[in-house]
Amino acid sequence: MRTLWILAVLLLGVEGNLVQFELLIMKVAKRSGLLSYSAYGCYCGWGGYGRPQDATDRCCFVHDCCYGKVTDCNPKTASYTYSEENGEIVCGGDDPCKKQVCECDRVAAICFRDNIPSYDNKYIQFPAKNCQEKPEPC
C-alpha cells in the first residue's frame, strides 16, 4: 500500500503521456515502469547515452529513438487513446502524431514484457560513467 501511495505522489506533477506510458507498462508487462525502468541501464529514464547494457535497456534505447522520430507533438506530454482488443493494445484516435507516440509506448511495453528475463538488478541506478561509449545510431 505504501508503494502505491508513493507512486501516486510521484505522478502528481506528471502530465499526459508519461502517466499513460506508466499505465500501459503496468497493463502489458505487469510491472511499474516508474519503479522498474525509470533509472535502469544507460537508456531507461531521462536522457541516454552509450550502449544499451542488456535487452531491457535496449527497449528503452529503441523507445528513445522512436520518440526522436516524433515531430508534430511532444511525445512526453501528448495524450493519446488506445483500447484493448483480444488481449492486444490498439492505438487509436485521429491525430497521427499522438497515434505515433502511442505506438512507441505500446512497442516499448511489449518489449519490457518480452524481456523480463533479461532484467538485472545490477543495472538499477547504473552510473552514467559506465555509459560513455559512442552511442549506436537509431
From Swiss-Prot:
Expressed by the venom gland. PROSITE patterns: PA2_ASP (PS00119), PA2_HIS (PS00118). It is found in: Secreted. Snake venom phospholipase A2 (PLA2) that shows very low inhibition of ADP-induced platelet aggregation in platelet-rich plasma of human, rabbit and guinea pig. PLA2 catalyzes the calcium-dependent hydrolysis of the 2-acyl groups in 3-sn-phosphoglycerides. Its EC number is 3.1.1.4. Belongs to the phospholipase A2 family. Group II subfamily. D49 sub-subfamily. Pfam families: Phospholip_A2_1. This is Acidic phospholipase A2 Cvv-E6b. It comes from Crotalus viridis viridis (Prairie rattlesnake). Residues 1-16 form the signal peptide. Its cofactor is Ca(2+). SMART domains: PA2c (SM00085). Keywords: Calcium, Disulfide bond, Hemostasis impairing toxin, Hydrolase, Lipid degradation, Lipid metabolism, Metal-binding, Platelet aggregation inhibiting toxin, Secreted, Signal, Toxin. GO terms for molecular function: calcium ion binding; calcium-dependent phospholipase A2 activity; phospholipid binding; toxin activity.
